[in-house]
Curated annotation (Swiss-Prot):
GO MF, one example: structural constituent of ribosome
Gene Ontology CC entries for this record: ribonucleoprotein complex; ribosome
BP-aspect Gene Ontology terms: translation
Annotated organism of origin: Leptothrix cholodnii (strain ATCC 51168 / LMG 8142 / SP-6) (Leptothrix discophora (strain SP-6))
Residues making up the signal peptide according to the UniProt record: none
Protein name as catalogued: Large ribosomal subunit protein bL34
UniProt KW keywords: Ribonucleoprotein, Ribosomal protein
InterPro entries according to UniProt: Ribosomal_bL34 (IPR000271), Ribosomal_bL34_CS (IPR020939)
Family listed: Belongs to the bacterial ribosomal protein bL34 family.
Length: 44
């Protein structure tokens, strides 16, 4: 059986990237929470 995590930069960015986060209200709240916490990386 193959492992479930098969890394791909494109897929990673398309599902968890900054632009995707900004599209929905929930995603924007994620970015806001990470900004408030002082995260160095807001999104992938």
């Amino acid at each position: 059986m193959k492992r479930t995590y098969q890394p791909s930069k494109v897929r990673r960015a398309r599902t968890h990237g900054f632009l995707v986060r900004m599209k929905s209200r929930g995603g924007r709240s994620v970015i806001a929470a990470r900004r408030a916490k002082g995260r160095k990386r807001l999104a992938v």
